[in-house]
């Protein structure tokens, strides 16, 4: 089983992290370890390759960074857990669809650990609350880039955020889409304590461990047939 390193990078400027992801992927060799970076960003909007700038309704003083992932516009900020997956998909024998499925399953698994019920939506990547007063609201977004069979970018899970910047955009291109965090969803740990921003490290580690478990479950027997983008 091919290991996956987990690296806690803490608070980091988005543009600098984006540059590092591109450089890491461009310099990969056959023996470069697969890794998951756990990051928190200062406030920033990011717009995907095919993103429509019209979905940025009111930028205010939050910078916009155009990036090479799929998807539309999203927001990153303090209190959000971001996991970047820098993986050699061919070596792991993973197709892109299996990677997306693993990411979404890991988020659902992590939220369930904190007593938050969530689900996928067909045709709308990400994870959404499945019950309660905020049913249908988005709590996690994902976007990926595959280059020479290797992935970067990843998934963001809203933990304890100022959610107001999401009202300045059409999140992921959907006008009026409600966006929530784990605090709003009433997340609680195993002891019944309500989670807050101080749980960032614990939640990020839980998400990373769930990602590793889901990815290992989906490893294929024939790596050469995997991702070719």
Swiss-Prot record:
The record marks 138 as: Lowers pKa of active site Cys. One of its GO terms (cellular component) is cytoplasm. Pfam families: LplA-B_cat. It is an enzyme of class 2 (transferase). GO terms for biological process: protein modification process. It catalyses: octanoyl-[ACP] + L-lysyl-[protein] = N(6)-octanoyl-L-lysyl-[protein] + holo-[ACP] + H(+). The keyword Cytoplasm applies. It is found in: Cytoplasm. InterPro entries: aa-tRNA-synth_II/BPL/LPL, BPL_LPL_catalytic, Octanoyltransferase, Octanoyltransferase_CS. Substrate binds at residues 69-76, 141-143, 154-156. Gene3D superfamilies: Bira Bifunctional Protein, Domain 2 (3.30.930.10). Residues 30-223 form the BPL/LPL catalytic domain. The active site is at 172 (acyl-thioester intermediate). GO terms for molecular function: lipoyl(octanoyl) transferase activity. Keywords: Acyltransferase, Cytoplasm, Transferase. Pathway: Protein modification; protein lipoylation via endogenous pathway; protein N(6)-(lipoyl)lysine from octanoyl-[acyl-carrier-protein]: step 1/2. Catalyzes the transfer of endogenously produced octanoic acid from octanoyl-acyl-carrier-protein onto the lipoyl domains of lipoate-dependent enzymes. Lipoyl-ACP can also act as a substrate although octanoyl-ACP is likely to be the physiological substrate. Belongs to the LipB family. HAMAP family: LipB. In the reaction, the free carboxyl group of octanoic acid is attached via an amide linkage to the epsilon-amino group of a specific lysine residue of lipoyl domains of lipoate-dependent enzymes. This is Octanoyltransferase. The lineage of its organism: Bacteria, Pseudomonadati, Pseudomonadota, Betaproteobacteria, Burkholderiales. The gene is lipB.
